[in-house]
Amino acid sequence: LVGSEMCIRDSCYTYQGQQGKEQFDLEPEDEVFLCNWAKENYGTEFIFVTNFPSSKPPFYAMNDKEDPRTACKFDLLFRGLEITTGGQRIHDYNEQLEKMKAQGLDPEDFKSYLESHKYGLPPHGGLGIGLERLVMKLLGQANVRQASMFPRDMNRLLP
């Protein structure tokens, strides 16, 4: 399966006529809309959403060097649901320190994390995939509990 990619600025806010929105974020109905749009226009059930505002992702997400207003972050949507999120991480000590301060975080609270930056980190990234979410969508289930061997919720903490 081939996926398509869309900058978040051009995503559902453009296609649903909400171009003037200041805050770029995806609601569940936006994710469904984007996946339907990708399927209709590109014949794929996967779509990558990129270029999130740099103020939204976590403090460790690297800003895009060409457009510092955006972060090097992505979400992968499949059949109307985010199944993966990831991006490039900051590996420069001073850049990490600046971003923490810009987000109102106290660097003292992250002393051991920052130590690794002082000694040199290679460029790196990461991602997280919701395997149970993916299985739920592949099997056409309505709830993630139906795709989990030992589902957890407010009333069930043990198998």
Locate predicted features.
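Metal-assisted phosphate- and nucleotidyl-transfer catalytic regions
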Residues: 4, 9-79, 102-115, 119-121
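Structured core elements
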Residues: 48, 73-77, 82-84, 128, ...
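Short loop/turn segments at secondary-structure transitions that flank enzyme active sites
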Residues: 55, 82, 153
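Active-site pocket scaffolds in enzymes
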Residues: 87-88, 93-159
